């Protein structure tokens, strides 16, 4: 069937240049923030819109949606439309990258690496974590990027356990600074890169040990990768984390 885009009201011109869009319609929102006590009336309009699509294009009474709130699901069910989770469908489709997508991904990664390089060159004792973190944001916007999903940057004792957010903590000489870019860069593609620096590159013995372990893991796993390898096989053969680091391991 056709690709129909629901755009902001009176903003159809924003997407009129997209050649993959067959039709543009005004979006209908039924959330309370936008509509107050009229939200239920807007929801009925949206339900009627879906029913119109179902009569014209649906081959079954099922619709796959990735995110939808409770009242909409309930009303669709009442009107004979079964809602199924679209996540598995969308994620499997996203596994296959077109040549254009690969170019966009490389562009986003390039911008992230420029930002990382600037962060490393400007890192100095006395600046706050937030000051350092702002460099990545500025670089991303400067090169046509969009936004950053998280604030995962920490220094010194705050780096372990992981996942602490950037703060106004002052970075000290010799501390380790770690971060995840979590950056939605140019063309809306994500560049999620993890990096760790030591302020002024003066490693103590513990930092040298951690660096060596990290390099061992990267080198070991890199040598495993080959064309046609399944993720399951890679996981089974991949480097095993030493037991002493297991309690504070990354959750993924």
Q: Model-predicted segments: where are they?
A:
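Active-site neighborhoods and metal-handling regions in enzymes and metal-associated proteins
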Residues: 1-252
């Amino acid at each position: 069937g056709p690709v129909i885009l629901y755009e902001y009201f009176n903003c159809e011109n924003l997407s009129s240049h997209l050649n993959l869009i067959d039709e543009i319609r005004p979006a209908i929102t039924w959330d309370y923030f936008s509509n107050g006590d009229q939200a239920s009336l807007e929801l009925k309009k949206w339900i009627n819109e879906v029913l119109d699509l179902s009569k014209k294009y649906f081959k079954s009474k099922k619709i796959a949606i990735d995110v939808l709130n409770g009242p909409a699901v309930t009303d669709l069910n009442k009107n004979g439309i079964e809602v199924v989770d679209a996540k598995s469908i969308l994620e499997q489709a996203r596994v296959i990258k077109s040549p254009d997508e690969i170019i966009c991904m490389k562009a986003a990664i390039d911008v992230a690496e420029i930002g990382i390089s600037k962060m490393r060159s400007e890192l100095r004792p006395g600046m706050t974590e937030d000051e350092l973190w702002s460099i990545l944001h500025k670089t991303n916007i400067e090169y046509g990027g969009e936004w950053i999903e998280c604030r995962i940057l920490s220094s010194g004792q705050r780096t372990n356990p992981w996942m602490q957010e950037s703060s106004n903590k002052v970075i000290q000489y010799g501390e380790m600074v770690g971060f995840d870019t979590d950056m939605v860069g140019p063309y809306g593609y994500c560049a999620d890169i993890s990096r760790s620096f030591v302020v002024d590159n003066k490693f103590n013995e513990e930092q040298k040990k951690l660096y060596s372990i990290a390099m061992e893991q990267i080198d070991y796993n890199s040598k495993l990768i080959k064309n046609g390898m399944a993720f399951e096989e890679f996981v089974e053969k991949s480097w095993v984390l030493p037991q002493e680091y297991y309690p504070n391991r990354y959750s993924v």
